[in-house]
Amino acid sequence: MGDYKHIEKCVGNFIASHYTRAVEVGIGRNEEAAQIISNAGALLRCTDVKAPGISGNLPFSQDDIFSPDLSLYAGAEVIYAIRPAIEMIPPLIELAEQINADLIVYHLGFESYEQGGEILDCGVLLHRYHVSQNPSNRVD
């Protein structure tokens, strides 16, 4: 279980240090990354298809990535997901394109979607599948 906390901390620290407006898709019950991002003042909200058992201090909206409510993601610089099911990647990419946000995914093991996007190493390997067209959102 310690490995999962390491992953969450790496993802949370990366997002918090590179973005000011983030949305986590598919939070489930693992809120470590979202807490780090929230503590940095950069978390807009978390979403999941089911109401998860997370702390009441995290902003949460129930939403289905296969039919997203775009208003929940408005203003986000980055959409991120930790260990999403591979079938969630195409609608995540579409959402990121629609709202002009980066999309960053941490996959389980060595999974990836198509070519895997741009690889970002923050202590764990992240896949950036979409890059915002807004130059102020660029992560180098």
What annotation goes with each model-predicted range?
Residues 43-48:
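Conserved SAM-binding motif I beta-strand of class I
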